């Protein structure tokens, strides 16, 4: 196992215009302060205020948006980071681990990773993801990529259909089809930060949001040693070269994770579990009393000093005894949140320290709060109650189905852009209006300038005389559409769908 030295991981250099020379502790901290400014002032963060956490198109400001959720995750991440550093200081290990002059950057990387962790999520959350992937699967059929004979391939896009005698090209076709059918919010976050927003963050800061290490074009089983880390796609084919450079800069082995990402993940797990239940009470899906009984029933028998007793029962009893001065709802969730944090944060911090050799190497194949402990059971309790009583509620399911229909419908509306030939689309990009393609011209005008420029830049770097050129061009055209639609807020996607479907407002 390699020696633990965080100076080799907290890399303050950037992809472009990187600071040069040896830096003092204060200068390094200023570099990460610059990252904070770039992130907090980015449009991608602002858009989170109109993407909802559980309840799409919610008008009640007390119910969490992705932005308010991310701010809560940021605070919990800061708490865990400080707890880790405090414990390492007590153990007199800060200097041994190369952290004595990097405590500020350590905290900042964790905080900003937490704030950014949802920036790649499409409108309507997981149902938006599912809509994008299902729509592309119905056209590209990635499951036919190994089909024999090749004539069994059902892909409806001619340039991506497998052909006899073109094996090197067929392998690229397989990768592209698989990649496009595995849109994922975390992978889109990497694409946003590097390719679309060009935020030019430090290598360490980007490493903090590389939550999953599986390429989106991966086919087959994942290695058992990295099964958890490769649970979902973490980056696209379009960012393959950037991620290869990132791994080199952060000393990450293939499919390994950046150490501070485990802290961001734990902060998210702690935050959303309580928040989803609080939002459900705010939405009147159940009362606080009903929630307490759901939690009690799901946990089962327990001793007086059990974690359930110390966290949930304690919150319930305190909220009832103080109900005259403040509402039971506010009291209950205040105590539940405080009790949960006071138990889970120190536990997550100690798990990080206990497993630091594997975490530093990027190979710890678990979440910090997924083990056989009572702390893990408490998180599972919150999640299971939310799944059973919140996500399955008719109002929530109806909104999710509407969201799925909106995203599918928008992709269908913009499909003519994908149906154009390479030469026709190239002409449209150059001229921005083609008389013989009036519908396509108008659809193209609606695309964001930032996304169009990303497409143009990517295609301009391709050798136009290569047999791979038509494949890559179509890939980036699909990315253009996915970038545009996934970047919409819930409300904008809803309104855009209604406008283009000529539905009365």
Swiss-Prot record:
Its cofactor is Mg(2+). InterPro entries: dGTP_triP_hydro_central_sf, dGTPase, dGTPase-like, dNTPase_1, HD/PDEase_dom, HD_domain. Its EC number is 3.1.5.1. It comes from the Bacteria. It catalyses: dGTP + H2O = 2'-deoxyguanosine + triphosphate + H(+). Disulfide bonds: none annotated. Residues 66-273 form the HD domain. GO terms for biological process: dGTP catabolic process. Pfam families: HD (PF01966). Homotetramer. This is Deoxyguanosinetriphosphate triphosphohydrolase. The lineage of its organism: Bacteria, Pseudomonadati, Pseudomonadota, Gammaproteobacteria, Enterobacterales. The gene is dgt.
């Amino acid at each position: 196992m390699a020696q633990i030295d965080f100076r080799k991981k907290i890399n303050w250099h950037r992809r472009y215009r990187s600071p040069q020379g040896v830096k003092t502790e204060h200068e390094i901290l200023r570099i990460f302060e610059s990252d904070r400014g770039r992130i907090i002032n980015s449009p991608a963060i602002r858009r989170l205020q109109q993407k909802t956490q559980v309840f799409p198109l919610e008008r009640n400001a007390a119910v969490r948006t992705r932005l308010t959720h991310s701010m809560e995750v940021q605070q919990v991440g800061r708490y865990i980071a400080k707890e880790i550093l405090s414990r390492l200081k007590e153990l007199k290990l800060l200097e041994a681990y190369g952290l004595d002059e990097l405590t500020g950057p350590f905290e900042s990387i964790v905080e900003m990773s937490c704030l950014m962790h949802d920036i790649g999520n499409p409108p309507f959350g997981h149902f938006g993801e599912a809509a994008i992937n299902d729509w592309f699967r119905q056209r590209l059929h990635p499951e036919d990529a190994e089909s024999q004979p090749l004539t069994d391939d059902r892909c409806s896009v001619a340039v991506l259909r497998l052909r006899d005698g073109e094996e090197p090209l067929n392998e690229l076709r397989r990768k592209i089809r698989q990649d496009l059918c595995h849109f994922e919010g975390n992978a889109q976050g990497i694409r946003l930060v590097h390719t679309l927003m060009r935020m030019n963050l430090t290598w360490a800061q980007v490493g903090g949001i590389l939550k999953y290490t599986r390429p989106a074009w991966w086919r087959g089983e994942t290695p058992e040693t990295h099964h958890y880390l490769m649970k979902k796609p973490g980056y696209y084919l379009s960012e393959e070269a950037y991620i290869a450079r990132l791994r080199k800069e952060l000393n990450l082995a293939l499919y390994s994770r950046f150490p501070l990402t485990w802290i961001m993940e734990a902060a998210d797990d702690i935050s959303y579990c309580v928040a989803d239940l609080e939002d459900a009470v705010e939405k009147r899906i159940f009362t606080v009393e009903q929630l307490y009984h759901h939690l009690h029933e799901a946990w089962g028998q327990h001793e007086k000093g059990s974690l359930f007793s110390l966290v949930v029962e304690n919150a319930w009893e305190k909220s009832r005894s103080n109900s005259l001065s403040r509402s039971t709802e506010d009291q209950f969730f205040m105590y539940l949140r405080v009790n949960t944090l006071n138990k889970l944060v120190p536990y997550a911090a100690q798990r990080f320290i206990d497993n630091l050799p594997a975490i530093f190497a990027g190979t710890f194949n678990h979440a910090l709060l997924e083990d056989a402990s009572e702390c893990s059971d408490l998180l599972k309790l919150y999640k299971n109650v939310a799944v059973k009583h919140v996500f399955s509620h008719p109002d929530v399911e109806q909104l999710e189905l509407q969201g799925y229909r909106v995203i599918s419908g928008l992709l269908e509306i913009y499909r003519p852009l994908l149906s154009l030939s390479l030469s026709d689309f190239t002409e449209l990009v150059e001229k921005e209006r083609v008389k013989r393609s009036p519908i396509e011209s108008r659809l193209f005008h609606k695309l964001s300038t930032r996304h169009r420029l990303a497409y143009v830049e990517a295609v301009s770097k391709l050798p136009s005389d290569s047999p791979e050129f038509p494949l890559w061009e179509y890939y980036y055209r699909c990315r253009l559409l996915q970038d545009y639609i996934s970047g919409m807020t819930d409300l904008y996607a809803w309104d855009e769908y209604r406008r283009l479907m000529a539905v009365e407002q």
